Amino acid sequence: MGLVRSLCLLITFLNCLIISVHGQATARPGPVSGTRIGFYLTTCPRAETIVRNAVNAGFSSDPRIAPGILRMHFHDCFVQGCDGSILISGANTERTAGPNLNLQGFEVIDNAKTQLEAACPGVVSCADILALAARDTVILTQGTGWQVPTGRRDGRVSLASNANNLPGPRDSVAVQQQKFSALGLNTRDLVVLVGGHTIGTAGCGVFRNRLFNTTGQTADPTIDPTFLAQLQTQCPQNGDGSVRVDLDTGSGSTWDTSYYNNLSRGRGVLQSDQVLWTDPATRPIVQQLMAPRSTFNVEFARSMVRMSNIGVVTGANGEIRRVCSAVN
């Protein structure tokens, strides 16, 4: 009987493991007081469904909101923590800072908030809506979902000057490492999270310096010659700097690992991306993430949970905004 019972327990464990593997990535939240999986289970049980439906509707109208919301969450967390301060509008707020001027998807977050206030007034924070929406955009672009710890409250301060430390398109690996490390993220988190560039675009004005004038040369020598000619056609030297180019050439709207493969071929659009391949500190990680049995999806989920717990406001601090674009 003991043997039979042990076998039954083993089978039960394996069944649970299979469900976990084929469902969503099992990323667990870090030790942050106040955030947990299912925070709104009793106070607003349909919270995640309402957010998901709002994101689905926004994506159906304009698929560009997927990389926009993902980037918005990243920028929110990197400036005084994941407190929804990126969502506040007005003069000299984070939204007006240079790196944030082209962010898309604010209307999706506002729509979700309106519906949540109707269903559960004063319960769900804008910071949590943004964290949940970022996860949902990955799913919509054929990525793998994960469990998002919730329970954040909203910050009351949003200053454009605080956005100066956001990672930039010309940053070296060393500079990127410094910026990530300052927030408790390591080099692997850096390479994994930047893999979010598998969806989205960049304006020609952001990287055109690589195409025509880099350190006295005609172009950045790390760019594949064929790709260089392609980029120069898309982004002429005196052309419109607002023209958008896929960050993951050939697969710019699908969540996959081709972004890393492009780096290995000298086809990274941003300088800060391409150096992940040329720098020996990060190249081995890129090689692992582009491998046939890549763990990118699982690792991205884990790093997103780590990032989403940066500097969160919980407990009696902060507030639950009535509208995401303004403090109460």
From Swiss-Prot:
GO MF annotation: an example: peroxidase activity
Induction details: Induced in response of mechanical wounding. Induced by methyl jasmonate, a plant defense-related signaling molecule. Expressed under a diurnal rhythm (circadian clock control).
Residues binding Ca(2+) 1: 76, 79, 81, 83, 85
Glycosites: 213, 262
Record localization: Secreted
Regions annotated as coiled coil: none
Marked site positions, Transition state stabilizer: 71
Residues forming the catalytic site: 75
Keyword presence, Lipid metabolism: no
Catalytic activity, reaction form: 2 a phenolic donor + H2O2 = 2 a phenolic radical donor + 2 H2O
Enzyme class: oxidoreductase
EC numbers, comma separated: 1.11.1.7
Disulfide bridge map: 44-120, 77-82, 126-324, 204-235
Any one GO CC term of the record: plant-type cell wall
A Pfam family hit: peroxidase
Cofactor: heme b; Ca(2+)
Protein's job: Removal of H(2)O(2), oxidation of toxic reductants, biosynthesis and degradation of lignin, suberization, auxin catabolism, response to environmental stresses such as wounding, pathogen attack and oxidative stress. These functions might be dependent on each isozyme/isoform in each plant tissue.
Further remarks about this protein from its record: There are 73 peroxidase genes in A.thaliana.
Protein name (Swiss-Prot/TrEMBL): Peroxidase 71
Organism of this sequence: Arabidopsis thaliana (Mouse-ear cress)
Taxonomic classification: Eukaryota, Viridiplantae, Streptophyta, Embryophyta, Tracheophyta
Gene designation: PER71
